[in-house]
Design a protein with these regions (language model features):
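Short, glycine/acidic-enriched loop or turn micro-motifs at the edges of active sites
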Residues: 31-33, 137, 174
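Short Asp/Glu-rich motifs
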Residues: 92, 140, 174-175
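A short, structured active-site edge motif that brings together acidic residues
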Residues: 130-140
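Acidic, divalent-metal-coordinating active-site segment for phosphoryl/phosphodiester hydrolysis
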Residues: 167-179
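Mixed-charge, glycine-rich, non-catalytic linkers/tails in nucleic-acid processing enzymes
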Residues: 182-183
Length: 183
């Protein structure tokens, strides 16, 4: 086990707190755009990791109750037709709370994913608060000197294959792989 001394700016979680007995909710969201206040989630994936292995997972398309811009459909492959009969966020909110309760919210650029999940809960009148951990910041500290810390570059660097980029479950599984290398 590697031990590093630093605090992540996005949270109060330090590398010393990374251990093989904590629960981590590794999450990715796909959205209708880049600003959580104005845009909505179209897909969410959560993979629970106990510090040693994956223990549970959840993934679903979500009906954002608005049109998905063409540029987003081109990027993610998620279309209005695909989400037309998908659940709305409020229909899966309880499951998201239950899966992430007591877990550290882990994402690649955590401020993006966390802000969208938090904003969706705020629209429902609920505060969503979790400790957060950013795999971008972690990777910069643990693997210094890489030309880029984007998920696609880390996948290339570590030889991680993924079926489809910009789909929540595939990106989350790639994040799990990066996360395990950091642990």
């Amino acid at each position: 086990i590697r031990v590093y001394c630093f605090i992540f700016a996005a949270s109060n979680v330090s590398v010393q707190e990374l251990n093989h007995s904590a629960l981590y909710a590794i999450i990715d969201v796909e959205t209708t755009g880049g600003q959580a206040r104005y845009e909505r989630i179209t897909e969410i994936a959560i993979v629970l990791h106990d510090g040693q292995r994956v223990v549970d997972s959840f993934s679903t398309l979500l009906n954002p109750e608005r049109s998905i811009p063409w540029s987003i459909t081109q990027l993610t492959g998620i279309s209005d037709e695909m989400v037309a009969n998908a659940p709305r966020f409020f229909e899966v909110a309880k499951q998201i709370v239950q899966m992430t309760e007591g877990a550290i919210f882990v994402a690649h650029n955590v401020s993006f994913d966390y802000s969208f999940v938090r904003e969706e809960f705020a629209r429902l009148g609920f505060a969503y608060t979790r400790k957060q951990l950013c795999t971008v910041r972690m990777a910069r500290k643990v693997f210094p000197g890489l030309p880029s810390y984007s998920l696609s570059n880390l996948k290339r660097h570590f030889g991680i294959s993924a079926e489809r980029s910009h789909r929540a479950l595939d990106d989350t599984l790639a994040r799990v792989n990066v996360f395990e290398r950091i642990l």
